[in-house]
Amino acid sequence: MGEADLLFQLDGDADVMKYITLGIPRTMDEVIEKSMPRILKSYQDKTDFGIFAAYLINSDEYIGWFQFEKDKEFEDSIEIGWRLKKQYWGNGYATEVAIVLCELGIKMGKTIVARAMIENLASIRVMEKAGLKFEKKFWYPHSSSPDVLYKR
């Protein structure tokens, strides 16, 4: 299975996309045109930053991806994020990796930031478990409700 197929398992699922595209799943063409270039760029840059595929250790089952990228808004900050297939929600994977990513970024001397729609209580809880603290509420132009920024 190719990378676009794996990503389509996430982006083609309305439940996974609920707090990203207001629940509108992406088509395979949209995955190839919009999602893949961003992910492939992180591999081509060959840095410690990017969006990285996540697999279960015991089975090599693809479960989603994790983000560890230089933040575009705050200098010397790293944004963390995650997108998991819904059958892997609630297993602690997002929290486990978020904690590791926070520790890695802090060792690099960076501030860690994460963002989520205010209704995305599961992601907000992951941020809190990873030690991030509420910083502010803000609005993206395309959003129907506010987002929140957490920092550590």
What label would you give each PLM region?
Residues M1-L6, L10-K18, A53-R152:
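Acyl-donor (CoA/ACP) binding surface of acyl/acetyltransferases
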Residues D45-T47, S143:
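Short solvent-exposed loop/turn micro-motifs enriched in small/polar/acidic residues
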Residues T47-D48, Y62:
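Short, basic and Ser/Thr-rich N-terminal targeting/leader segments
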Residues D15-I39, D48-G50:
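Conserved GNAT-fold acetyl-CoA-binding loop/helix
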Residues E30-K34, T47, G92, E128-G131:
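A short linear-motif detector with a strong N-terminal bias
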